[in-house]
Amino acid sequence: MSPSGPNLNNKEHNRASEKKNSRTHNKKTNRNQSKEKPVSSRSVETPKNAVCLEPVGTDPVSNVATVDASKEEQDEDEQICFICAEGITYSCVLPCNHRMCHVCALRLRALYKTKECTFCKTEWDTVLITKDHEIDIHDVDLAKLPFQDEKLGIVYSDEHAQEESNLLLQFNCPEDACDITCKGWFDLKLHAKVKHHKFFCDLCVKNKKVFTHEHTLFSKKGLTKHNEVGDQGSDLEITGFKGHPKCEFCNTHFYDDDELFKHCREKHERCYICDQVAGRPTHQYFKNYDSLERHFEKDHYICRERECLERKFVVFGTEIDLKAHQLDEHPHNFTQRELREARRIIPQFSYDPPGASGRNRRERTSSTPSEQSTSVNETANSLSNLHLSRGEIAHLRQEEYVREQQARHRDFGFTLSNPAPTSARPATSTRTISRGKTRTLRNEDFPSLAEVANQNSSSAPSVPVSAPRLSGKSASRNHVPSPPKGTKSPMASSEQAQHQQVIDRMQKLTNYDDHKINDFKFAVSSFRGNVMPAREAVARITKLVAKPHEQLSGVFNQIANLLENKEKSRELLEAWQEWKILNAKDDTRIGTTNSNLLRLKRSNRTAAQTASVWNRIERAAAHDGPSLSAPSSSINLANITSRPTNSSAANTPSWGVRKARASALNARSEEDFPALPPSTSKRISVQLGKKQARPVDSWGSTPNTSSNRNSNTMGVSKKKNGKKQTVLFHIG
């Protein structure tokens, strides 16, 4: 090995380390230069191993960052409506200088019929819609502007703003790719049926406060599903709509629970006694008075006096209340002995099971006759092996004593309570057998009104009088003397004349063809007697004339007016309208094309599909609701989104119109504090007077609104006297 070997190796090692250090130094300097001063051109010469930097804006990542930054700047500069949280194209300026978008202004004035300011609740007759977002309405002479809508009280700054606003108020087809605008609801429904084979929901059309193009078209199956279960399982599930409530008696759907309860109050009967009794379902409805009578006879106590039967609803929840009513209202029907015995009340109590109470009652000494004491002693001896306390044995002895007293007094017939089980309450009178015989004699001495009318009538035969019977068709209550057979009432003669007018009109339309007239009479009578459906009857009648579209509208209207059943009238008119839609020949005349309609749907599709926008509009249109706070500069309205979260969608009621979202408006409502669930623990109820009914739905079950709420118990912790208490609810 030569002596110069190690030195050469050291030199080579030093050279390699210098090259390495120079490379790292070049990299650091290049990085620092790129941070301090960006390269703006590709013409810069770079070393072979240097990093080539692209100019700003040419790299795809840099392009994305630049576009995002520009969008954020545009979003910050864009005006946001404080009601719907959407971008403002045209501003609606009120005389109080509060502002909103022109879409919300049209919703409030055209759909909700309100001219109040959303923020200060001041009513203004005239507002201004303009493109200028910073304009002061007091600097503009509204009377000189030619573009005005006097019906809505809106003044437009230019013609284009007026056209954009009027486009929202037209009868536009809701289909996404359709640009047809119709003249009215009939033409729009006809167009949807013929062109798209879809239908509108009539309940939503009548009650829903949205623009025409914001409605939803359904197929036949989809419309049935919409009424029954709502938007579950479809694209509109975010609205939380659970279907239109249905009246089980009439088999008819209604828009919401308020409409259903209104219908039940007007068309059906309600048991007011069940509303007062604790533990029973409140708001329990019955189809008619006959079914309510059967409920009274089965579960309650009815006064059988004639005047009370004629008055109706003279029913009591307990037998003691019935006896008190008889003593107060009908004392002449009792003898002195019966009055004295009726005022005696044998108490009956419901005791807790043995061992429920910790206190021991003193054993009562027996002062009854020998046979009673014997039975009591036997009962005590039978209970001695049960290891009961002295108080429990005394309690059972007392119950045995009360039962024996009732058995003894039952022979004299003046008990106020039937010892039979309470599950099968008697519906018979509380009188004794002897009293019932006396009552029969008095009915014969004082016959009912039906018997007197039958005796005075010369044409009607005499009918034996029966005891008063509680029925909606009872002669003792609803008897109306019928006119003599030889004379006709003016109402009957007028109705017969109207029938003859319909026959004469059809004879002219059919050229007095007897076969066609017979077919017409057969179709009408079959439909009236529930033998033929409305669609088949309409189809038969339309085949009898040459031009049914022009000739039969008046005929069907007259037939509908003559039908006694309003439901049948509605079915006939709906079948006639459906026939006209299905058999429309010239469907090209329905509606006109509008090129701006598709642009309107694309621009407003997000707002129209979200229930939160309708929630805010509903809240803003409320007359008695709190006014919205005016927007301040510290609030970043661009961050407010109109898309509901999953949690809010589950709690949103049908189609999102009954509850308003308060997250964007910093407001609270009573829906933020759901009601507590009903207690399931067994309680002792003392019926002293009337009790306030608990709200449930029409059919006695838990209402849908409470089932959709969060059932978690909400408590507020408070400190009192150094202890922490939980307040579950407040009264008053």
Curated annotation (Swiss-Prot):
**PROSITE patterns associated with the record:** ZF_RING_1 (PS00518), ZF_RING_2 (PS50089), ZINC_FINGER_C2H2_1 (PS00028)
Compositionally biased intervals (Low complexity): 457-468, 701-713
Please list the reactions this protein catalyses. S-ubiquitinyl-[E2 ubiquitin-conjugating enzyme]-L-cysteine + [acceptor protein]-L-lysine = [E2 ubiquitin-conjugating enzyme]-L-cysteine + N(6)-ubiquitinyl-[acceptor protein]-L-lysine
What is an example of a GO molecular function annotated in this UniProt entry?
ribosome binding
The PTM Phosphoserine maps to S482
Write out the pathway annotation from the protein's UniProt entry. Protein modification; protein ubiquitination
Superkingdom to which the source organism belongs = Eukaryota
The keyword Ribonucleoprotein is annotated on this UniProt entry: no
Could you name the Gene Ontology cellular component terms for this entry? cytoplasm; cytosol
One GO biological process term is: protein ubiquitination
- Annotated Polar residues bias: 366-380, 415-433, 490-501, 629-654
> Which one Pfam family would you cite for this protein?
zf-C2H2_13
Entry's localization field: Cytoplasm
Q: Does the keyword Aminoacyl-tRNA synthetase apply?
A: no
* General function of this protein: E3 ubiquitin-protein ligase that plays a key role in the ribosome quality control (RQC), a pathway that takes place when a ribosome has stalled during translation, leading to degradation of nascent peptide chains. Activated when ribosomes are stalled within an mRNA following translation of prematurely polyadenylated mRNAs. Acts as a ribosome collision sensor: specifically recognizes and binds collided ribosome and ubiquitinates the 40S ribosomal proteins rps20/uS10 and rps3/uS3.
Name of this protein: E3 ubiquitin-protein ligase hel2
Q: Which source organism?
A: Schizosaccharomyces pombe (strain 972 / ATCC 24843) (Fission yeast)
**Could you read off the lineage of the organism from its UniProt record?**
Eukaryota, Fungi, Dikarya, Ascomycota, Taphrinomycotina
